[in-house]
Amino acid sequence: MRQSRLSIIFAAALFFKCYALTVALPMAKAEDGSLEKDAFTSLLNDEATENSLGDAELSSMTKSRAPRVIVIAADANLWRDLRVLHNGLPLYKRRVDENNQVVEHKDVGQDLTIPILRRDTMRCMVGRVYRPCWEV
């Protein structure tokens, strides 16, 4: 489901990038039917000039264009939240576990070789209800 959303977003971004030039053209050009051809040829001409430019011409070309912005998520919490959502755990549970200090119970029947975070996510059947194993 997530991959289909991502592919739809990329398709929409590519679609709007291709037709962004046609939006700025006046309606008089749209009536003669050459609107799509003009946009397509201008895109091809831009790509051809970018591929054939030298270093000096490229630096002058980039100055006249609007700068491209690349956004990189530098916050580690954002990536962790995305990983948690991808793994299927609810985000609010992850944040609650971080904010609250978990009291560690030392029961005799509890397996101490399993790390505490893993024990909190494991579920044990208690009666008819699944509960975290450390509550058992």
From Swiss-Prot:
GO terms for biological process: chemical synaptic transmission; neuropeptide signaling pathway. It comes from Oreochromis mossambicus. The keyword Metal-binding does not apply. InterPro entries: Prepro-melanin_conc_hormone. Belongs to the melanin-concentrating hormone family. Keywords: Cleavage on pair of basic residues, Disulfide bond, Hormone, Neuropeptide, Signal. It comes from the Eukaryota. Residues 1-20 form the signal peptide. Plays a role in skin pigmentation by antagonizing the action of melanotropin alpha. Induces melanin concentration within the melanophores. May participate in the control of the hypothalamo-pituitary adrenal gland axis by inhibiting the release of ACTH. One of its GO terms (cellular component) is synapse. Disulfide bonds join C124-C133. This is Pro-MCH. One of its GO terms (molecular function) is melanin-concentrating hormone activity.
